[in-house]
From Swiss-Prot:
PROSITE patterns named in the record: HIS_KIN (PS50109), PHYTOCHROME_2 (PS50046)
Xref: SUPFAM superfamilies: ATPase domain of HSP90 chaperone/DNA topoisomerase II/histidine kinase, GAF domain-like, Homodimeric domain of signal transducing histidine kinase, PYP-like sensor domain (PAS domain)
GO BP terms in the entry: detection of visible light; osmosensory signaling via phosphorelay pathway; regulation of DNA-templated transcription
Family classification: In the N-terminal section; belongs to the phytochrome family.
Segments for region (Chromophore binding domain): 17-495
Organism: Pseudomonas aeruginosa (strain ATCC 15692 / DSM 22644 / CIP 104116 / JCM 14847 / LMG 12228 / 1C / PRS 101 / PAO1)
Protein name (database record): Bacteriophytochrome
Enzyme Commission identifier(s): 2.7.13.3
Residues recorded with modification Phosphohistidine: H513
Keywords for this protein: ATP-binding, Chromophore, Kinase, Nucleotide-binding, Phosphoprotein, Photoreceptor protein, Receptor, Sensory transduction, Transferase
Enzyme class, broadest EC rank: transferase
Underlying gene: bphP
Its job: Photoreceptor which exists in two forms that are reversibly interconvertible by light: the R form that absorbs maximally in the red region of the spectrum and the FR form that absorbs maximally in the far-red region.
Positions with a binding annotation for a tetrapyrrole: C12
Domain GAF: 139-303
Length: 728
């Protein structure tokens, strides 16, 4: 090995095993063009068949017999893919002749019949009996166990194994029937590299693969390249295709001299294999192998049915629980509480060691404390803000290299509410387990005539490995259940939002008519009360103040409803003396709250085209905010200036300091800070939210500056925009 020629697994994983350029020697191969002209033939054709098939020639009846020519004519004149087989006598031997077409090339394979017709008929009848028998199984484990026993009894192989692929493409021997003197491989695991991806594809395309003698000498196909395309002949569907020398060496290291594999294909994927091994050469006749092809299809169908039944039962149970959970959530006043039910809630929906519900700033862990790990997961998911489902079975454990690690290796998370940060998490603990590998799962470097290459391991004695850092993987069924729940909850939240919107519209109607009209009547009645009586005057003032406060609250709610429903605020800009307007608002505030110290610096003659009522609403809101949230007894500074192209109204007050989170949420409605403020128990926390909307309706904005425990709100309106007199 040198720095110039690095050695990788490419020798195995990138090996073009579908174009080996050779076949196994127990048969012969002829490839033909679409008009029947010979393109190439295996080098043993004359020795096996007694004639030469030279490129450019045509097969004759004297060479292959009338049955073969009729079969070939059928393929050459047909449309689409073609495959067929016949038996014919050539010289002293009976041959099975197998034909197929692939990529515009026609292939004829000649294989000597090694068994008499009676034996084949008996075998076929026996195979049919077993096919009928295996269909009675109701679980996969008993099916595989029974089939391995029957296959060994029928074929006489020394060992038959049922080999099932796992989620990581490694395989495990899950059933075995063997000669008593052979070591058992049952329960052993084999790495994915033992059967690389291109080999798995061929197992799907060609479900029966036979090696009659592992120690065979490959018979080359001549010429190696198709003279029509200058490409190698693709032997993917050839029954005689030569096998990878790495695979032959692998079998030799196991002590195997002959093998046959029968694929189990489920849902278009290689689910498993029946692998047959013999310690001496063994050739199974082609007609018998064709019975196994039917057997492969039947077993694949049964496994698929059983797996689908198992998954269907899991989905049935989970669907019942999911629908019950959805009903409880739909009927509950508190969605968070319905989801966080400890007994039959989300933790019972998917097999897990614990769960967590997060919604609107509230979190609840079930069967443990998972809040910190959930926070770490969300922090990682910030890199992909559009992702609504996440899963892993190897979340890192806490360490110096991974400070955001968690106690659970398995994490499955779904987001069902974006605005309220609604998430559900399922967690699985680390699963420390021992794997019994069939030999140490590695390949060794050897130097051969073609340079460095990787060779398979030489020992298949059980080698144990302790695997850490992984949980039980989340299955496709788990993910499907989680996704269905996510969609259910999203629909529930949308329906809830629609209902809230309908109620808001009704509230707007009530506030706008049924409540506002009586308030106006109360105000008018208060104004008509006699002003000569001191008691009456005080009563009138109380009634006026209370009704005015209620009207302001009603107006704020109406404004917010319009904003959140997308209607927007209406502004009617007119030429306005802003200086006079601000003085008036300051004066009204000073009268209403005599304990509030207000200092002013108002430039005279500041005019703008604004909606005076809306502008006054913003000014009053900013002063009210300063009174409620500023330090008691400290003055509030109000300034009005024209700065270039902007009219700027600033309200400054001292405060006890605000966190970054509080600053970020200043303009959000219904803030917790407003609800907890004892000096503003009647407020809704929507004044700044509406003020910002009014500023934006004037094509302006409200800036905030907070430093050294002093906060300044500045309403900025563009003069040019204002001078146009436009409205929005």
């Amino acid at each position: 090995m040198t720095s110039i020629t690095p050695v990788t697994l490419a020798n195995c994983e990138d090996e073009p095993i579908h174009v080996p350029g050779a076949i196994q020697p127990h048969g012969a191969l002829v490839t033909l063009r679409a008009d029947g002209m010979v393109l190439a033939a295996s080098e043993n054709i004359q020795a096996l068949l007694g004639f030469v098939a030279s490129p450019g020639s045509y097969l004759t009846q004297e060479q292959v017999g009338p049955e073969v020519l009729r079969m070939l004519e059928e393929g050459l004149t047909g449309n689409g893919p073609w495959s067929n087989s016949v038996e014919t006598r050539i010289g002293e031997h009976l041959f099975d002749v197998i034909g197929h077409s692939y990529k515009e090339v026609f292939y004829l394979e000649f294989e000597i019949r090694t068994a008499d017709t009676l034996s084949i008929t008996s075998f076929t009848l026996n195979a049919q009996r077993i096919i009928a028998q295996v269909q009675l199984h109701n679980d996969t484990a008993s099916l595989l166990s029974n089939v391995t026993d029957e296959l060994r009894r029928m074929t006489g192989y020394d060992r038959v194994m049922a080999y099932r692929f796992r989620h990581d493409d490694s395989g495990e021997v899950v059933a075995e029937s063997r000669r008593e003197d052979l070591e058992s491989y049952l329960g052993q695991r084999y790495p994915a590299s033992d059967i690389p991806a291109q080999a798995r594809r061929l197992y799907i395309q060609n479900p029966i693969r036979l090696i009659a003698d592992v120690a065979y000498t490959p018979m080359r196909v001549f010429p190696a390249l198709n003279p029509e395309t200058n490409e190698s002949f693709d032997l993917s569907y050839s029954v005689l295709r030569s096998v990878s020398p790495i695979h032959c060496e692998y079998l030799t290291n196991m002590g195997v001299r002959a093998s046959m594999s029968i694929s189990i294909v489920v849902g278009g994927k290689l689910w498993g294999l029946f692998s047959c091994h013999h310690m001496s050469p063994k050739l199974i006749p082609y007609p018998v192998r064709m019975s196994f092809q039917i057997f492969s299809q039947v077993c694949s169908a049964i496994v698929e049915r059983l797996e689908q039944g198992r998954i269907a039962e899991l989905l049935r149970v989970s669907t019942e629980r999911r629908l019950a959970l959805a009903r409880r959530a739909r009927d509950a006043d508190d969605l968070f509480g319905a989801l966080a039910h400890p007994d039959d809630g989300i933790a019972a929906l998917i097999p897990c060691d614990g769960a967590l519900v997060m919604l609107g700033g509230r979190t609840l862990s079930i069967r443990g404390d998972f809040e910190r790990q959930a926070g770490n997961v969300l922090q990682r998911l910030q890199r992909d803000p559009e992702r609504d489902i996440y899963h892993t079975d190897n979340w890192p454990q806490p360490s110096e290299d991974s400070p955001d690690g968690g106690d659970c290796c398995g994490v499955l998370a779904i987001r069902f509410h974006r605005q309220e940060s609604g998430w559900i998490f399922w967690f699985r603990h680390e699963e420390v387990h021992r794997i019994r590998w069939g030999g140490k799962p590695e390949k060794l470097l050897t130097i051969g005539p073609s340079g460095p290459r990787l060779t398979p391991r030489g020992s298949f004695e059980a080698w144990e490995e302790v695997v850490r850092g992984h949980s039980t993987p989340w299955s496709e069924t788990d993910l499907a259940i989680a996704e269905k729940l996510r969609l259910d909850l999203m629909e529930l939240c949308l329906n809830h939002a629609a209902e809230v919107d309908r109620m808001r519209q009704r509230l707007i109607a009530v506030l706008g008519h049924d409540l506002r009209n009586p308030l106006q009547s109360i105000s008018m009645a208060a104004a008509l009360l006699s002003s000569s009586d001191t008691r009456t005057t005080e009563l009138r003032q109380h009634i006026s103040a209370s009704s005015s406060r209620m009207e302001r609250l009603v107006s704020q709610i109406l404004d917010m409803s319009r904003l959140q429903s997308g209607i927007g605020l209406t502004v009617n800009p007119v030429d306005t003396d802003v200086s006079q307007l601000v003085r008036q608002i300051v004066c009204e505030t000073d009268v209403a709250y005599p304990g509030l110290v207000i200092e002013i610096a108002i430039d005279p003659q500041v005019r703008a085209v604004v909606d005076p009522d809306r502008y006054a609403q913003v000014a009053a809101n900013l002063l009210s905010n300063a009174r409620h949230h500023g330090l008691p007894g400290r003055p509030v500074l109000v300034t009005l200036t024209r700065q270039g192209d902007e009219v700027c109204l600033s309200v400054l007050n001292e405060t006890s300091g605000l966190s970054e989170a509080q600053l970020a949420n200043l303009f959000e409605p219904f803030k917790r800070e407003s609800a907890d403020n004892q000096r503003n128990r009647n407020g809704l926390g929507i004044g700044l939210y509406i003020s910002q909307a009014i500023a934006q309706a004037h094509q302006g904005r409200i800036d905030v500056d907070c430093r050294d425990d002093v906060i300044t709100f500045c309403l900025r309106l563009p003069v040019r925009q204002a001078e146009t007199g436009s409205s929005s």
